[in-house]
Amino acid sequence: VVAFGGRVLASATKGVKVKYVNSPESEIYHKSNELYGIYFAKQAIVKQDRCFLVEGYTDVISMHQSGIENVVASSGTALTPGQIRMIHRFTNNMTVLYDGDAAGIKASIRGIDMLLEEGMNIKVCLLPDGDDPDSFARKHNSTEFQAFISEHETDFIRFKTNLLLEDAGKDPIKRAELIGNLVQSISVIPEAIVRDVYIKECAQLLHVEDKLLVSEVAKRRETQAEKRAEQTERERRMAERTAMMSQGS
């Protein structure tokens, strides 16, 4: 045990209006480095070679009680590089479970590019309106829950494309922004073959030529490489200065 974490069941409870209440950060507890449920889930994740990602504590507890153990929670925060590496130690496959809150989904998908950057296979499953993983798990056993996921989960890039297309409608400016958004997600994927597959599929969905997306992805990757090189150089100079200061003292 490294900290306490709680879910506020009524936003008006004693004036508390936040969704989750956690212990303050300490020498042993850094929220960005923890995944709720990982200790109990890791064996099931390895065995099934898949991890389910949910938002909160009650989602994990109810899914465990229903018989689904390969599940962890980000505790209401965007995934951090440390959390992603923790999951990636056990599997390359993740399914993110969302409730029907469109605003929440759009906010959450912004952080999934980091999973793609790690080369992970990401899928998304949207639960029925009015349900979250907690309530859905309390209504269904593990077989029914797993069957629903298998039937409704979608590849992340395809899910993101359809979600943003619905939001953009026929607005040309929004559609241009949509293309830029998708290009950014595809560009961080390390495997060239996977990028090529996504480019072809997105080109069909967006009714644009493959070569346009190929060109834009190449530009983004070049920019990313330049930024990484600059960061490496900054770190090298910082290390040199630190070493010189140590020698001087």
Model-derived features: where do they sit?
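Phosphate-handling DNA/RNA-contact segment within nucleic-acid enzymes
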Residues: 1-90, 94, 108
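A charged alpha-helical hairpin associated with nucleic-acid processing machineries
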Residues: 42-51, 78-94, 99-249
